[in-house]
Amino acid sequence: MIKVLIVDDEPLARENLRILLQGQDDIEIVGECANAVEAIGAVHKLRPDVLFLDIQMPRISGLEMVGMLDPEHRPYIVFLTAFDEYAIKAFEEHAFDYLLKPIEEKRLEKTLHRLRQERSKQDVSLLPENQQALKFIPCTGHSRIYLLQMDDVAFVSSRMSGVYVTSSEGKEGFTELTLRTLESRTPLLRCHRQFLVNMAHLQEIRLEDNGQAELILRNGLTVPVSRRYLKSLKEAIGL
């Protein structure tokens, strides 16, 4: 079975695609999402083989969302768009294919045929890593979804319950992005196995006798530094 996740902010568009896909014996629709933030979490949890992704969505577009996915778990991307002008850009973002809205059954069948051929070669395909830098981090907290600009990020921490972003004001939000994704796509530096820090917010490095250290940020919060990453942090500030 080919596991499919549909992401589109238009309910009717999701329904139309769902109807077309439900007629395929080897297709399993594992979920539907109305925005990119929901979709990022669904990709991590559901592990779809294929992502049918609308390009034009509010706040975070489909093109932007691709750059936020963990390269290790990125499915095939089939972009959905009402405008042919997005086709070239879609393939620059490592798309497997793109479909123009309204989706035609024959055109969809061609995409599914290609997917089946790829699946016969390997069970799961991971697309090339997108090197585009993230300008913000999508977060949830206090009953809302918001985009935290990189300049406002103080540090990011990983816990048993997930990854959390702390702002310059000390407020904390949950993100579906992994530490690895954030490390590779933002200016945040690794200072500990469970922490990334924004060096623009650094005020002081407090050295400890055991070879470890502690970062004092301008908002007064502290971030641990392990011996493994202390040297690279010193180099980052010219020491």
UniProtKB/Swiss-Prot annotation:
The modification 4-aspartylphosphate is found at residue 54. Pfam families: LytTR, Response_reg. Keywords: DNA-binding, Phosphoprotein, Transcription, Transcription regulation, Two-component regulatory system. This is Transcriptional regulatory protein BtsR. Residues 137-239 form the HTH LytTR-type domain. PANTHER family: STAGE 0 SPORULATION PROTEIN A HOMOLOG, TRANSCRIPTIONAL REGULATOR-RELATED. One of its GO terms (cellular component) is cytosol. One of its GO terms (molecular function) is transcription cis-regulatory region binding. Phosphorylated by BtsS. Residues 3-116 form the Response regulatory domain. The gene is btsR.
